[in-house]
């Protein structure tokens, strides 16, 4: 959770635009989209390598994704706009929490390793808060953040507060550097909850 999450919501557009892309300096393109069912296995394997072997069980990951596909946006590279021979290189994942889930998160009672979908809004519904569940975007994050923003759109996500937990000192420093603050206490540390407020949809439209 140590990436520059602050830049996600301020950049979101009014309507979601799945599959947006941009050119890479070294050639080719990078794009984001909802992973296919088959690609979820690759996503899970990458998570175990890049984050931890003891992440949420695969059945939990699939249940969250089925409940709200916006929980996962895959990152892909390809030679050109045809997207032939596209390669999966990473992803962003979120828990789009309803009011009950948000309340549990603030109290420190939400099990984010085994989240129950009853605390997550279904697809198309505006969440009360967004918890950054995981990010794997090695060497491509600066290209991907605007694409994630466009894919989500401001209608459901603009103005929704972002939450994340710092797992490393480097991650905590990066989070503080982009504006995250302790959600429950000013001097929050490792393993504690951080919050970042994003502008409402009206402010995004006016920008």
Model-derived segments and spans:
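Short amphipathic alpha-helix that is part of the acyltransferase structural core
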Residues: 5-68, 74-88
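GNAT/GCN5-related N-acetyltransferase fold signature
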Residues: 75, 92-94, 137
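Protein kinase-like catalytic core scaffold
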Residues: 87-90, 131
